[in-house]
C-alpha cells in the first residue's frame, strides 16, 4: 500500500464525541476534532485561526489514554495510512508504515510478506504512530529492537523532523515523546529495520508452553508459529476492548534495585521476578496486584479484570474518574503491602 498523496484540506468537527476513539469507551467530548490523513494537514492546522491557539491532542487508537474530563481543544485523529518497503540491503528490509496504521495489522502484513521480527508484539492495541511513544513491548521484545527512524511534525510549527533511535531516547515503556516531547509532536510515519536472518525470541515460558501445546518444538518454530502463539495467549488473557472497555496492561512492571528486591523476597519468597542485565529486577505488577486481593474487584463501574489483574476494565458507564480512583487505590495497597510503587501506562487527561 503506497503512502497517501498530499492533501492539506482540513475539516474540523465541533463538539466531537470521543467514546469511540478510546479503548476504555469513556464518554468525553472534544471542542474540535480533525481527521488527519496526510502530514500537510498539520501545517494547515497550524495556520487555521479557529484552532491554532487551542491545546492539541494526537489520538491514534486511543489505547493509551484515560479521559477524566472533556478536552477543551482540538483532537487530531491520526489516520495516516500506508505500508511499504522503502529499501533493502543484504542484511535487512526497511519497512515504513503510516502513523495511523493499526499496529497488529501491520505486524501481520510484515509476516505475510516474509519479513519476520515483530511477531512477539502481535495483538498489542493501538497504532504504528503510538508504538514508539510507548516503546511497546511484550514477551521479551521491545519495539526499539527493530526501530530505524520516524518522521514527526512539530505541532507548534507544522514542520517535519526525522528522529533516529538515539534522539528518541527509548526506555522501558518510555521515550522522548513521553517526556520532553510530550504533546509537542505528531508521528507521521515509522520505519523499521527487519533483519533477513530471523532470530526467534522465546525467553518467556508462556510462549514456549503455547508452542508445546500446539505440538511445535521451540527450535522448530517459525515466525508465524510465534505470532499465532502470542495471539492465542493474549486473546486468552486479555479482554477484547470492543466487548469490555480497557487499555490493555494498565501498570508498568516495576523495576527495583537488588537490595530492595532482596528485602521484598525475604517477605514474599514467591514473588514473580525477572533479573535485568544491569543488575536490577523487574517485578510482575499483575502478581503484586493479585496478592493485594484486587483481581475481580470493582470500584463503581471500573473493575480489575477477573483473569488478568494488570488490566482495568469499564464494566459499563465508567468515567475516567472511576478508573483513576481504582488505579490509585491499587497503587496505595501495593505500596503499603510491598513497598513498591506502580506507575500507570496510560496518560490520564
From Swiss-Prot:
Listed under GO cellular component are:
cytosol
The record's Pfam families line, in alphabetical order, gives: FAD_binding_4, MurB_C
InterPro entries registered for this protein in UniProt: FAD-bd_PCMH, FAD-bd_PCMH-like_sf, FAD-bd_PCMH_sub1, FAD-bd_PCMH_sub2, MurB, MurB_C, MurB_C_sf, Oxid_FAD_bind_N
Tell me which residues this entry annotates as catalytic.
173, 249 (proton donor), 345
Give the EC number. Answer: 1.3.1.98
Q: What sequence ranges are listed for the domain FAD-binding PCMH-type?
A: 24-197
List locations, semicolon-separated: Cytoplasm
Cite the GO molecular-function annotations of the record: FAD binding; UDP-N-acetylmuramate dehydrogenase activity
**Pathway(s) the chain acts in:** Cell wall biogenesis; peptidoglycan biosynthesis
Enzyme class, first EC level, given as a word: oxidoreductase
Catalysed transformations (reactions): UDP-N-acetyl-alpha-D-muramate + NADP(+) = UDP-N-acetyl-3-O-(1-carboxyvinyl)-alpha-D-glucosamine + NADPH + H(+)
Q: Which cysteines are joined by disulfide bonds?
A: none
Which cofactor does the UniProt annotation name?
FAD
Keyword terms: Cell cycle, Cell division, Cell shape, Cell wall biogenesis/degradation, Cytoplasm, FAD, Flavoprotein, NADP, Oxidoreductase, Peptidoglycan synthesis
Q: Which GO terms describe its biological process?
A: cell division; cell wall organization; peptidoglycan biosynthetic process; regulation of cell shape
Q: Which domain of life is it from?
A: Bacteria
Q: Which family does it belong to?
A: Belongs to the MurB family.
Q: What does this protein do?
A: Cell wall formation.
Under what name is this protein listed? Answer: UDP-N-acetylenolpyruvoylglucosamine reductase
Q: Which organism is it from?
A: Burkholderia lata (strain ATCC 17760 / DSM 23089 / LMG 22485 / NCIMB 9086 / R18194 / 383)
Amino acid at each position: 500500500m503506497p503512502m497517501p498523496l498530499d492533501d492539506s484540506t482540513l475539516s474540523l468537527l465541533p463538539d466531537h464525541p470521543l467514546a469511540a476513539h478510546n479503548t476504555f469507551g469513556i464518554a468525553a467530548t472534544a471542542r474540535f476534532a480533525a481527521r488527519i490523513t496526510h502530514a500537510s494537514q498539520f501545517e494547515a492546522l497550524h495556520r487555521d485561526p479557529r484552532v491554532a491557539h487551542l491545546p492539541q491532542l494526537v489520538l491514534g487508537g486511543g489505547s493509551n489514554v484515560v479521559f477524566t474530563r472533556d478536552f477543551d481543544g482540538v483532537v487530531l485523529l491520526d489516520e495516516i495510512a500506508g505500508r511499504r518497503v522503502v529499501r533493502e540491503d543484504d542484511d535487512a528490509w526497511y519497512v515504513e508504515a503510516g502513523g495511523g496504521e493499526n499496529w497488529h495489522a501491520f505486524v501481520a502484513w510484515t509476516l505475510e510478506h516474509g519479513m519476520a521480527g515483530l511477531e512477539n508484539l502481535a495483538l498489542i492495541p493501538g497504532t504504528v504512530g503510538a508504538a514508539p511513544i510507548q516503546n511497546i513491548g511484550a514477551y521479551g521484545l521491545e519495539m526499539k529492537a527493530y526501530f530505524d527512524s520516524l518522521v514527526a511534525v512539530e505541532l507548534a510549527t507544522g514542520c517535519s523532523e526525522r528522529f533516529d533511535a538515539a534522539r528518541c531516547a527509548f526506555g522501558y515503556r518510555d521515550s522522548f515523546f513521553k517526556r520532553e516531547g510530550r504533546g509537542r509532536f505528531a508521528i507521521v510515519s515509522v520505519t523499521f529495520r527487519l533483519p533477513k536472518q530471523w532470530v526467534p525470541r522465546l525467553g518467556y515460558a508462556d510462549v514456549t508452553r503455547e508452542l508445546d501445546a500446539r505440538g511445535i518444538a521451540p527450535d522448530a518454530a517459525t515466525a508465524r508459529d510465534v505470532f499465532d502463539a502470542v495471539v492465542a495467549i493474549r486473546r486468552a488473557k486479555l479482554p477484547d476492548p470492543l466487548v469490555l472497555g480497557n487499555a490493555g496492561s494498565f501498570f508498568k512492571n516495576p523495576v527495583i534495585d537488588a537490595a530492595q528486591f532482596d528485602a521484598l523476597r525475604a517477605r514474599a519468597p514467591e514473588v514473580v521476578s525477572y533479573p535485568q542485565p544491569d543488575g536490577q529486577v523487574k517485578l510482575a505488577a499483575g502478581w503484586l496486584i493479585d496478592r493485594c486481593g484486587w483481581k475481580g474487584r470493582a470500584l463503581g463501574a471500573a473493575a480489575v479484570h477477573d483473569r488478568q489483574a494488570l488490566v482495568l476494565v469499564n464494566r459499563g458507564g465508567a468515567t475516567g474518574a472511576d478508573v483513576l480512583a481504582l488505579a490509585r487505590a491499587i497503587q496505595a495497597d501495593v505500596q503499603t503491602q510491598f513497598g513498591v510503587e506502580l506507575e500507570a501506562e496510560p496518560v490520564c487527561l
